[in-house]
C-alpha cells in the first residue's frame, strides 16, 4: 500500500469518459477475462472455493 497515489491525484471520470473505458470482466472468484483470453488469480480462486465449501455451495459474492 505504500506505493499508492494520494486520492487527490486521481481524476474522477464522468459518464461520457467512463463509456470510453475498455476493460475485461471480473467474475468474483479469481477469474478475469478480456478479449484475448482469461487469467486466474489462484490464491483468490482457492479462497473462493474454500468459502463455497464452507457455506454449502453458496458463493460469497
From Swiss-Prot:
Disulfide bonds: 33-38
Superkingdom of origin: Bacteria
GO process terms (BP): defense response to bacterium; killing of cells of another organism
Subcellular location: Secreted
Disulfide bond among keywords: yes
Residue stretch(es) of the prosequence: 1-24
Keywords of the record: Antibiotic, Antimicrobial, Bacteriocin, Disulfide bond, Plasmid, Secreted
TM segment ranges: none
GO cellular component: extracellular region
Pfam families linked: Bacteriocin_II (PF01721)
Keyword Secreted included in the entry's annotation: yes
Family: Belongs to the bacteriocin class IIA/YGNGV family.
Function as written in the Swiss-Prot or TrEMBL entry: Inhibits a wide spectrum of lactic acid bacteria.
Protein name as it appears in the record: Bacteriocin leucocin-A
Organism this protein belongs to: Leuconostoc gelidum
Gene: lcnA
